[in-house]
Amino acid sequence: MKAIRFYPNVPADVRAIEQKAAMTILEAIHRYAETGAGRVKPLSGEFEGLLRLRVGNHRVFFEETADTITIHRVLDRKEAYR
């Protein structure tokens, strides 16, 4: 399993989400760290170098190395690309 790190703003992002959805998002992050499974897509443009994990109506923006996943933001899809 890859180590998971969070940028300082991520806890606030997660607290702003309904608890059930937040738990689903955290489970999806852990599943991806363990297995690589999930709806992941590399981003381009101003977000180039980041990956996006789609979890329901939310998007998890992160970068990945061989042994670490660093979560940058967790946002509702309506706010994700603004």
Describe the role of every protein-language-model region.
Residues 28-53, 81:
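A short, surface-exposed loop/turn module that caps and links secondary-structure elements
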Residues 1-12, 16-23, 38, 54-58, ...:
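Enriched for short, Lys/Arg-rich terminal
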